[in-house]
Swiss-Prot record:
It catalyses: N(6)-dimethylallyladenosine(37) in tRNA + (sulfur carrier)-SH + AH2 + 2 S-adenosyl-L-methionine = 2-methylsulfanyl-N(6)-dimethylallyladenosine(37) in tRNA + (sulfur carrier)-H + 5'-deoxyadenosine + L-methionine + A + S-adenosyl-L-homocysteine + 2 H(+). [4Fe-4S] cluster 2 binds at C190, C194, C197. Catalyzes the methylthiolation of N6-(dimethylallyl)adenosine (i(6)A), leading to the formation of 2-methylthio-N6-(dimethylallyl)adenosine (ms(2)i(6)A) at position 37 in tRNAs that read codons beginning with uridine. This is tRNA-2-methylthio-N(6)-dimethylallyladenosine synthase. Residues 428-450 are annotated as: Disordered. GO terms for molecular function: 4 iron, 4 sulfur cluster binding; metal ion binding; N6-isopentenyladenosine methylthiotransferase activity. Gene3D superfamilies: Methylthiotransferase, N-terminal domain, tm_1862 like domain.
Length: 484
């Protein structure tokens, strides 16, 4: 039921949708008085980008800090870290070493380390870099104002890397839209414990935000002009959002499919995406959402990691290559032209040439559009870090190059096949290449550049694709026949 107003959601009847209380519509809040400058450097995933935006919101609301692109003029400098790749810790300490000079002459700059490296290292960061004032984890970013005040009052570095369930979302200010597309975190952590991954140790186990809390945030963003919602989670399709307990009844739980159906009813929301998924949790309910919800973007990022069952077992992924392909077949039965992207780890300990060929066979069978692919990176403290790894680095790099070349060639053929088609594009702003043109993204995440009036920014337009290039598409706005 697209176009349903937020206040009508209490009577909306999507398939299996629960009765909802009316959701508040966002009203612009008075801007905070600017009392200082904030600089944030972000490494890693979209979840970190979301968290950094929330850090900025928290500190703007509580401390009056305004973002700056120059750390030298900032009163608070934060690095939001990622521990997925090798040598992440050393990169953080290199960054901190450069920032140490910011305190020269006794300037009272607050230096903070957040994110997953902070969760892993904790007090060790302060011991190695005693000029660091704050160390906080992904689940405690909402406590930044208290940590800053405690640091200033006590003169001692503050460390808080606890996992206080979902508390941080209850204490975040109203979201602020920064363009027509926005991220909304719907859950935190992961309980899959893949043998190569640090996420369960740095972000904790899976905790879902309450169903109605997510809807409130989406409604607030929609009221500010957001038209595309990107639902975020480390294992987003494991979402189980509680609802209904406030009425005295036992809580019920909404899965991702139901959440998508309900978000699609919120006025103004024209496109929904989600990331990152786990194949084990890719349910029939989600396939049905792809069948029934036109706002759900015609693309999916579903990390498979490898095509060899032996390697998948060693990774503790919980599925086989055949089971993965079965899920893709179900999805393509309802969305035949859906774009599929994935993650791959090349050179996992014990990977043979035969194992790698099975990965290449899977890639050929599925026809992936894009990939995030890397050579295996040993992460301390994970089960895989104890496995013997005797494959030469040159072999791993050669395999990676072959895999990436294959997927890139297929992606190029998909782009070429889009020439002559009409694509629905959300206009994001002026093109970087040519400020006299507009740019936006197609449903399958292709940047599209085209001539157009800046008044179209924030709207969906139909664009006839006229040219495919290596990393983008060109086109022209397709006028409705009724306009002639």
């Amino acid at each position: 039921m697209p176009g349903t107003s937020v206040s009508d959601l209490s009577t909306a009847t999507a398939v299996d949708a629960p009765a909802l209380l009316p959701l508040p519509v966002a009203r612009p809040s008075a801007p905070a008085v600017v009392r200082g400058k904030l600089y944030i450097k972000t490494h890693g995933c979209q979840m970190n980008e979301y968290d950094s935006a929330k850090m900025a919101d928290v500190l703007a609301a509580s401390e009056g800090l305004e973002l700056t692109d120059n750390p030298e003029e900032a009163d608070v400098v934060l690095v939001n870290t990622c521990s997925i790749r090798e040598k992440a810790q050393e990169k953080v300490f290199s960054q901190l070493g450069r920032w140490k000079a910011l305190k020269a002459g006794g300037k009272p700059v607050i230096i903070g380390v957040g994110g997953c490296v902070a969760s892993q290292e904790g007090e060790a960061i302060v011991k190695r870099a005693p000029y660091v004032d704050l160390v906080f984890g992904p689940q405690t970013l909402h406590r930044l104002p208290e940590l800053i005040r405690a640091r200033r009052e006590s003169g001692k570095s503050q460390v808080d890397i606890s996992f206080p369930e979902i508390e941080k979302f209850d204490r975040l200010p109203e979201p602020r839209a920064e363009g027509p597309s926005a991220f909304v975190s719907i859950m935190e952590g992961c309980s899959k414990y893949c043998s190569f991954c640090v996420v369960p140790y740095t972000r904790g186990e899976e905790v879902s935000r309450p169903f109605e809390d997510v809807l409130v945030e989406v409604a607030q963003l929609a009221a500010q002009g957001v038209r595309e919602i990107n639902l975020l989670g480390q294992n987003v399709n494991a979402y189980r959002g509680a609802y209904g307990a406030d009425a005295g009844d036992p809580a019920q739980y909404a899965d991702l499919g139901l959440l998508i159906r309900t978000i699609a009813q919120i006025e103004g929301i024209g496109r929904i995406r989600f990331t990152t998924s786990h194949p084990l949790e890719f349910s029939d309910s989600l396939v049905d959402a792809y069948r029934d919800v036109p706002q759900l973007a015609n693309c999916l990022h579903l990390p498979v990691q490898a095509g060899s069952d032996r390697i998948l077992s060693a990774m503790k992924r919980g599925y086989t290559a055949l089971e993965f392909k079965s899920r893709i077949r179900k999805l393509r039965a309802v969305r035949p032209d859906i774009s599929i992207s994935s993650d791959f780890i090349v050179g996992f300990p014990g990977e043979t040439e035969a194992d790698f060929e099975k990965t290449m066979k899977l890639i050929e069978d599925v026809g992936f559009d894009q990939s995030f692919s890397f050579v295996y990176s040993r992460r301390p403290g994970t089960p895989a870090s104890d496995l013997q790894d005797d494959t030469p680095e040159t072999v791993k790099q050669a395999r990676l190059a072959r895999l990436q070349a294959h997927i890139s060639a297929h992606a190029a053929s998909i782009s070429q096949s889009m020439v002559g088609s009409v694509q629905r594009v959300l206009v994001e702003g002026p093109s970087r290449r040519d400020p006299n043109e507009l740019t936006g993204k197609s449903e399958n995440m292709r940047p599209v550049n085209f001539p157009g009036n800046p008044r179209l920014i924030g709207q969906f337009v139909d664009v006839l694709i006229t040219e495919a290039m290596s990393n983008s598409l060109r086109g022209r706005i397709q006028l409705d026949d009724s306009a002639h």
